[in-house]
Regions:
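Hydrophobic alpha-helical transmembrane segments
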Residues: 1, 22-26, 70-84, 114-140
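Transmembrane alpha-helix entry/boundary detector in multi-pass membrane proteins
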Residues: 12-20, 32-55, 124, 129
Length: 154
């Protein structure tokens, strides 16, 4: 494997750990969201969406530190961003108007009198902006991890 491919795709073992961490994180957060455990968080505590994004950034730093690859590092930020933007409207769309109140931990577009279908369409339209955000934040987090590894002498 040449050096540029290794930098982009990473080493196999850390790449698998990154994938397992993100899949586990999103699965756990999905269950917490569906069971409405995110509404039981203490006042002033982090909302579930912010916590998922922060965990994705931590995984991206780990990707840089463990030579997991830039692509898995950026992906570890993109997937939580997609989760935060798309899962609540999908749940609202599938359940109908049952969740039209202030149930969500993300900003509700239905507060601006959108239907659940329109809310889902608008969430899907934000995907290119989420990709740009993931490239910026995930890339920066990856380079922080890679720089920390280089500074530590490993």
């Amino acid at each position: 494997m040449n050096i540029s491919r290794r930098a982009i795709l990473g080493v196999r073992r850390p790449r698998r750990r990154i994938a397992a961490a993100i899949v586990g994180l999103l699965a756990g957060c999905t269950f917490a969201f569906l069971l409405q455990l995110d509404t039981a968080m203490p006042p002033g505590g982090w909302e579930l969406g912010v916590a998922v994004f922060a965990a994705g950034l931590v995984v991206a730093v780990y990707a840089g530190w463990a030579r997991g690859g830039a692509f898995p590092g950026v992906g570890s930020v993109l997937l939580p961003l997609l989760w935060v933007a798309i899962l609540p409207p999908v749940v609202a769309y599938l359940r109908g108007r049952e969740y039209s109140g202030s149930r969500y931990s993300t900003i509700r577009l239905s507060d601006a009198l959108h239907t659940t279908g329109t809310e889902l369409e608008l969430a899907i339209e934000t995907v290119p902006y989420l990709l740009v955000g993931a490239l910026l934040f995930g890339g920066a987090a990856f380079f922080v991890g890679a720089g920390a590894r280089r500074l530590s002498g490993r």
